[in-house]
Amino acid sequence: MLSKDEKERLRGLSKEHAENVGLHMLAAYSIEEEEPELALEHAKWIARQASRIDLARETLAFIAYRQGDYKLALKEFRTAYRMNGYLDYLPFMADCERGLGNPRKAIEVASSEESKQLQGDAKAEMFLVYAGALGDLGLWDKAIETVHTLSLAKGLSGGYRMRAVQAEQNFLEQNGRSEDALALEPLLDKLEAQYADEDDEESSQDVAVDYDLEKLSDSKLEQIGIEAEDGGFRRRS
């Protein structure tokens, strides 16, 4: 069943057409894992039939993204973004650039003025994408520093803390620092036991891993975009 917000976003269509689009949307999401190709066809139909509705383009963008069709996903995310200016698309747009083999473009998106306005989980997602793009370019030290600093943020949800440590371990291995990567195993085991199978409904005050950000320099925090005073995420204008 569509949420109240989703129904509201379909109000530009006639009642009958909105119901049809909604049914195809539900079908696309319900069969996405078992029949991805058919789900994508449903999403394409939605985008064709409701091309001026941002939710329709968003639906196709996310389904294409999860199936690795980054060219189509990027096109649809850009279209939806032009329609509604929804900043939380930006990390996915940057990751699409990575998927298309354009890490420098991903970094441009991550470093844009619009991305500086991201908050919470969307901001954390962008840092992970940014770090991945640095890794794509072989800039392992910068990639490691980014995810390590991210993992220390006290306002970070447990799921993103886990992903940051996973990324750090992967980058360390890629950089030939196997012993350092292995040293993260106990911490990662703890985080994965807590968060690997949970939905993303976690408290912003999560303190599963208690690090002290005061040990990091203000300049490093400024570079990564984390508030030095409280270790939380901040909006930079």
Give the residues covered by each predicted segment:
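Alpha-helical segment of the N-proximal tetratricopeptide repeat
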Residues: 12-48, 59
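Structural motif corresponding to the intra-repeat A-B loop/turn of tetratricopeptide repeats
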Residues: 32-34, 67, 100, 137, ...
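Eukaryotic alpha-helical solenoid repeat scaffolds
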Residues: 1-5, 141-153, 157-237
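Solenoid-like repeat scaffolds
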Residues: 10-16, 44-51, 78-85, 112-120, ...
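TPR alpha-solenoid repeat register
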Residues: 23, 56, 89-90, 126, ...
